[in-house]
C-alpha cells in the first residue's frame, strides 16, 4: 500500500484506526463465507462518521484503489472478501442508535448489529420483526445491502420492507439521504416513498456497489409476547405449499413458516435435536414448522385453531413437536451459524426465491446434482412476504481435502 495513501487515511481517522499489519490484514481477508478463498487487502481503515467515510472515498478515488465496505463480516457469499491489495472500509465504529418513538422508527449506524438493536428496543417494548439467523454478529446495514430475510419474513417480507431511509456515501464521496429524512425540516424517518422515485431501493440488495451505507432507518413495532409453536405434516409437497398459501389467504399471523423434507429434518436433528429437547420422531415426507405471534393472546389462540383446521382439511395432520419452531424462533439470533458448522466442515450456499408452485422442481434438480457428484448437502426454506418461498441449498465439503472442495 502506498505510504502516501496510508498517511492521508491516518489524517482523516487517526493513526490508531488505520492498519497495514499483516495479522490485521489476514483477519480481514476472510468472512463467514467459508467456502471461498480469502484475499489480503493492502490496508484497513475504520472511520467513525459518515463524513470520514466520504473523505476516505475521495482519497481512494485519488489513488484509484478498490474499496470493500465491511461491517460484521457475516455474509455467506463472499460479499465482504476484499480485492487483493485493496482498501477495506470497516464500519463497526458507527454505533449510534436514535429512536423516534412517535414515528415508530429507529435510525442505526452501520456498525449496529441486530442483537444490539434488539437489546435497545426491548427496553422500550419494541422490536424490528425481521432478523437474519446470525443476528448477534450481523449488522443491520450489512443485511440491507444483501436484502436479507429470515425469522419474521413469512409475515413481514425481507429487510427491505422495514427500511424507511438510508444515509449513503456515493463512490465520489458525495453524501445523500433517502426517504423523508432527505427533507432537512422532517422530524425524522416517517416515510420511505417520498416525492419522486424510490432512491432507497437502489441501494437495497446492491452489495455495496453503488455506495457505502452509513446509517439505516427502520420501522419498529410493539413487541409481541404471545406465540404458538407447532409442526404440521403432509404426504405431498403440494399439500405443504397449499397449507402455507391458505394460512396467508386467511390472514393467520404466521411470523415464520419453514419447509422441511423428512430426510432433511433427520439431518438437522442430528445437529440440534438434543439441544432443542426433541425426541426421536418419525417425520413425514414434508413438514411445515410454524410460529404464530401477535400482541393479543386471543388472536394467537384463534389463529392456531384455524391453522390446525386448514392442515386437516388439506389431508395433513398436526405433528405436535412444538420444540422445533420454538427452537427456531427463540434461538433465531444464532441458529444458522451453529447448525452450519456443527459437522466441522465448510460449505457453500446459494439463496434463491421461488413461487409457491416452482420450488419443488428446483429441489429435485439440486438433489439430482448432489447424487450425481456424490456430494453431502441439503436444502430447506421458508415462506417470505406475499408469495415468495426462499430456499437455501448447502453443499458441504472437507476443507482439508482439496479434491473434495474442488
Describe the function of each predicted region.
Residues 96-100, 106-110, 114-249:
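FAD-binding subdomain of flavoenzyme oxidoreductases
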Residues 1-58, 74-104, 264-273, 325-346, ...:
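N-terminal flexible segment immediately upstream of the FAD-binding catalytic core
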Residues 69-73, 80, 91, 110, ...:
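Glycine-rich, histidine-containing beta strand-loop boundary motifs that form or position
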Residues 2-6, 46, 50-53, 110, ...:
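Generic structural signal for well-ordered, non-membrane alpha-helical segments
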Residues 43-48, 219-221, 228-233, 291-292, ...:
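Short, well-ordered beta-strand elements within core beta-sheets of diverse protein domains
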Residues 21-29, 241-406:
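C-terminal substrate-recognition/cap domain of FAD-linked oxidoreductases
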